Design a protein with these regions (language model features):
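Walker A/P-loop nucleotide-binding motif
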Residues: 1-21
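C-terminal alpha-helical "lid" subdomain
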Residues: 167-239
Length: 239
């Protein structure tokens, strides 16, 4: 344990879903601090982490050292009880450089055996670019696992749509989207799962309205025009 885990991906590629699955798999012996608003100073971030973990500290302190010491004592006590501590920061691409440096310093909190704090940074691709800058070299070197969520290709889009429909209760082997429709969906959404969900939902509604048993390219184009407007359609035809 310890160090940093990086999860990066464009908006809509499934970071929140992966995050949720990860949280569900954390053992009961884990204490978790989640920071969803990264527009914080270093002091505010440490205070928020302490609040999340129910750590006592002088509430009006302006001292980073006081907050770090309080966190360190908590981490040591947790370690002695056999518990793990995880700090998860979402939208981490918005963190200022001085805040990222303060977060790096938290990974210095360790025993002779191991790091006391596991930090998970979640953000858009700009986060990866930011961490590659020279001034964050030391933090970048402490990342022990990197995951980059990519858009789905056509085969993955087919499998994804099938899976979503089966989870919703559709019998296996039944296809509500013909191949041309799936190709169109992949092109129009650029393989972004969140957009695939929106477009499929609208196309299925259109098929229901026309009493059709299967979605074709025409229905997808019509649905895309309703949810995305004309710009994405013309962009898709030019691809």
């Amino acid at each position: 344990g310890g160090g940093f885990i990086l999860l990066a991906g464009e908006v809509g590629t499934g970071k929140t879903t992966v995050n949720r699955c990860l949280l569900e798999q954390l053992p009961d012996t884990t204490d978790l601090a989640i920071i969803l608003n990264p527009a914080l100073s270093a002091l505010e971030l440490l205070a928020t982490a302490c609040d999340e973990l129910d750590i006592d500290y002088p509430k009006k302190t302006e001292s980073l050292k006081a907050l770090t010491d309080a966190l360190h004592q908590f981490l040591l006590a947790n370690f002695e009880k056999g518990r793990k501590t995880v700090l998860m920061i979402d939208e981490a691409q918005h963190l200022d450089f001085d805040v990222l440096e303060q977060i790096r310093l938290l990974t210095n909190l360790e025993t002779n055996e191991e790091k006391l704090l596991q930090i998970i940074l979640i953000g858009q691709p700009e986060l990866t670019e930011k961490l590659a800058r020279a001034e964050l070299r030391q933090l970048n070197q402490r990342i022990t696992a990197r995951y980059n969520l990519q858009p789905l290709n056509q085969d993955e889009t087919t499998a994804y749509i099938r899976h979503r429909l089966e989870v919703a209760g559709l019998a296996g082997g039944v296809s509500l989207f013909d191949r041309g429709a799936v190709r169109q969906i992949n092109a129009l959404t650029r393989g972004i799962p969140r957009l695939i969900n929106v477009l499929c939902d609208r196309a299925l509604l259109g098929a229901y309205g026309q009493k059709r048993n299967q979605v074709n390219r025409s229905l997808v184009r019509h649905a895309a025009n309703e949810v995305f407007g004309d710009a994405r359609q013309s962009d898709s035809r030019g691809r």
